[in-house]
Amino acid sequence: MIVELGGTTVNSNFSLKDLGIIGNSPPMKALARQIETTARCDLTVLITGESGTGKELVARAIHQQSGRAALPFISINCGALNDTLLESELFGYERGAFTGAIQKQKGLFQAAHTGTIFLDEIGEMSPACQVKLLRVLQEGAVRPVGGLAEISVDVRVIAATNRNLGKEIGAGKFREDLFYRIAVLTIDTPSLRQRTSDIPLLVEHFLRQADEKMKNPRHHKIDGEGMTALTVYSWPGNVRQLRHVIERLVATTFESELITTEAIFHALPASLLSEMATQLPVIFRENDSLDDFLDRMLLLAYEQLRNQTGSHTKTARLLRIDRVSLYQRVERARQRVKRAS
């Protein structure tokens, strides 16, 4: 359904979950509010955040909640092409503009006309391309490579980067005037370590997706200790890394319904296990037994989740265990860790 909000048409028949934006944590609730607010206007948006945090999903969500929802959404990775190819892709070219240009070709700005264009990794764009993009934003028109006439375009521009563009401006690598053009509105996507209470929800979502993709008749589940192991890791690759790990787990435990902690440790590549060990110095101690390690991991995960949720009951719900059982397990772990110290 399309409705009017403050004079701007927006799409209300839409859920962030439809795009895989999953989470009930405070950072994700704040992100959802930002997406809704940003969708109500047509200003340019700069989405920042670490790699793997879902910046393109946020861009798609803004588009899907906007009045342009039924119109094109065009995405391009600005860091994946050299200057010549990027310019041709964005602005199009005339026949004979360069060797191999046997016929004229519309660019992505024209393809996105009346809709939205998403410029991913805009921080990788060369200074020469930045100048041409700035002109498009100023004039609302593109000039194809090899052409003389300008073609008007009505496009909402959303850009994203994992770079600190402020530092890039200071280093002379990014134009300040372009920055102010693309960053009228800004959204920062939270890292996974900033919203660890969302990990169980994401894990269940990715398990369902992987089972469907692999046509597995079973629905995989992860036991409590396994979920704890996934929760305490800091996930430097964020949601993208978590999704890949879950897909690997489903593929390597295809015949089993329950994924145990041992299965997780056996399925993960040695490089990731080593990385996890170095990132968990508080709980990973030399000469620890597996039980000692799991006890420390449970306590760390419990404290992290309880701090984020503010409630023992909500923490138990996230870990898919009743509150009394969780309390008993936490207390037993505390006693064992105390005796081992």
Residue ranges and their predicted role:
Residues 1-7, 12-18, 24-29, 36, ...:
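Nucleotide-binding/hydrolysis machinery
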Residues 7-11, 55, 267-287:
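Linker/hinge segments immediately adjacent to helix-turn-helix/homeobox DNA-binding domains
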Residues 20, 27, 33-99, 110-126, ...:
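Conserved post-Walker A coupling segment in P-loop NTPases
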Residues 31, 53, 76, 90, ...:
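Conserved RecA-like P-loop NTPase ATPase core
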Residues 34, 65, 93, 132, ...:
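Conserved helical "switch/dimer-interface" subregion of ABC/ABC-like ATPase nucleotide-binding domains
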Residues 45, 54, 60, 281-341:
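Bacterial C-terminal helix-turn-helix
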Residues 74, 104-114, 118, 126-132, ...:
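AAA+/SF3 P-loop NTPase mechanochemical coupling elements
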Residues 96-103, 139-144, 167:
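Short gly/ser/thr-rich secondary-structure transition/capping motifs
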